[in-house]
């Protein structure tokens, strides 16, 4: 379960503290040449797609947050289209040269939906296309676990204080994240928003197995978007590049 129904401009400010847009863009651009058709599953406020659109890619983004999709459409972007909906429900006859899902979007899906989403994604890819997945390892969750966190995010004369609470459901293997966002705008007005999301705990072997079952072959693994070596002990994020397995090889 996820909400993420708060103004997209606030998410953009918080995202800057967690992500390296330049590294992500360079990584994605290395997977498909300019002019390629790109699909972003879990596109959020469209940050990655706007940058790829500027580089000449033809882009489609899918996100379940109405607030984020509204912001992304207002923000514009050359050659970028946005669809409001869940990744597992997205249907199209178009084929893409690159499909990606970043910022732990894969962890937001229930375990019983993962294989279906990957099988559907396989159908979205062109025969020579590539899939890029970024997800959090099991130990990444364990090491970063804090029951209560207070963080401040600043940008565009806006101050966001994020009060986060984490809890664990061991039976479902999920992390529940509950957040209260206290926002002071540039004009001094203060507003309050609640946000929550569940994250499934995943492991590298589990995701590799699901990819194989869905008809993919893993071609590369990294520990980040600067193509750092993938950690062998399950810490930190894992970035996987996969290609459709030829039918004769299945």
Task: Mark where each language-model region is.
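Class I SAM-dependent methyltransferase SAM/SAH-binding core
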Residues: 46-89
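C-terminal lobe and adjacent flexible extensions of AdoMet/dcAdoMet transferase-like proteins
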Residues: 200-250
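SAM-dependent methyltransferase
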Residues: 132-208
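Conserved class I S-adenosyl-L-methionine
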Residues: 1-36
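Class I SAM-dependent methyltransferase "Motif I" SAM/SAH-binding loop
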Residues: 42-44
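A short glycine-rich, Lys/Arg-flanked "PGG" loop and its adjoining helix->strand segment in the class I
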Residues: 115-127
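A short acidic, Gly/Pro-enriched loop at the edge of an enzyme's catalytic core
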Residues: 91-98
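Residues lining the SAM
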Residues: 102-103
């Amino acid at each position: 379960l996820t909400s993420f129904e708060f103004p997209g401009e606030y998410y953009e400010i918080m995202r800057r503290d967690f992500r390296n847009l330049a590294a992500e863009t360079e990584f994605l651009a290395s997977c498909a040449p300019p002019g390629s058709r790109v699909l972003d599953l879990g596109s959020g406020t469209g940050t990655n797609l706007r940058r790829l659109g500027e580089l000449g890619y033809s882009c489609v983004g899918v996100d379940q947050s109405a607030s984020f999709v509204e912001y992304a459409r207002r923000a514009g972007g050359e050659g970028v289209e946005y669809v409001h909906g869940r990744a597992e429900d997205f249907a199209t006859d178009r084929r893409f040269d690159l499909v990606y899902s970043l910022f732990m979007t894969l962890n937001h899906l229930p375990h019983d939906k993962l294989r279906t989403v990957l099988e559907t994604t396989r159908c979205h890819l062109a025969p020579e296309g590539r899939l890029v997945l970024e997800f959090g390892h099991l130990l990444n969750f364990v090491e970063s676990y804090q029951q209560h966190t207070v963080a401040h995010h600043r940008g565009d004369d806006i101050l966001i204080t994020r009060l986060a609470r984490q809890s664990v459901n061991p039976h479902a293997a999920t992390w529940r994240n509950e957040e209260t966002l206290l926002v002071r705008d540039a004009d001094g007005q203060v507003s309050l928003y609640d946000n929550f999301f569940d994250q499934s705990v995943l492991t590298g072997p589990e995701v590799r197995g699901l990819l194989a079952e869905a008809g993919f072959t893993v071609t590369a693994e990294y520990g980040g978007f600067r193509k750092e070596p993938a950690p062998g002990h399950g810490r930190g994020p894992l970035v996987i590049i996969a290609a459709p397995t030829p039918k004769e090889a299945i």
